[in-house]
Amino acid sequence: MTSSEAFPSPNAPNMTHVKRIPTLKNSIFYSFVNSPEGTTIEGYGRKSWRIYHRDVLSVTLDQSSMIINEYKDTPITGEDPRAFVHNGTVYVQDNYLNDCHLYNTKTKEYLKIKTKGKNLSFISHKGRLYFIYYMSPFIMYEVNMTTGDITTVDVEQDGSHNGEYRGGTPGYKYDPILCFKAVLSQQLSASSNMGNPGPNYENIYYGFGHRVYYKDRPFPDGILKHDIFMWVVDFEGGENGKPSLRLYDVSKPANAKNVCDPTSVISINNKKYMVTAESNEWWFVEQEYVTNLYELTPPS
């Protein structure tokens, strides 16, 4: 996100509320993924909001009614699980703070990612797995899928430092409908500043994260807010062909709750939908926890 962009960004897609997805009482943070075969939508959610109750359920989503039609217990535990596809396999990220693991749903094995932090945004690119560690400044690593070791990726830096921007969904392949204006704005900037050639869309990915801040008053007296932003990574978009990252603030719908975390993007009948985990207060308290579905449409 360049400093001159308005809030919300004119290059970000629009969110239109479709429905609330009914879920088991007390369960929270459902992340959905189109199966590698393209036939089903599977998901993973935390069974209870209570701080020490971290069992993860697997579910399937009916693509016509958009209602969960099957719940199953799993051996997975997680804080706020995220699901993504890498090399034809669905992985579930447990997203524990300073103790992140990936669960391979085929082999039923865990891989410990040797890093600290959480809210890592994974991107499967040309058979290799990467993750965004920080949004601002942009920090990216590549994962060794045998050992869990990580290697720093040399990326373009723009000098920004803003800890409000945090990860959410994994990365998805460039979408010409949702991302065109954002990528065009990036390319115009790159062309004027660095003389880069036109983008290679095979190298471009997008996802969504949450921006954390307190409204009206600072912590702990202010109102906790999680707003949504879109990120776009171009693996060759920066100076000297380095990966580049741009952020675009999204206009949150009026019905969205104070804490609105994007968990995943799914495709149904050639349309893109975002799934969110929402509440009015921070987690781990007795309150209404909501799983919402929004249709994503091009920027106005």
Could you tell me what each predicted segment is?
Residues 1-300:
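Beta-propeller domains
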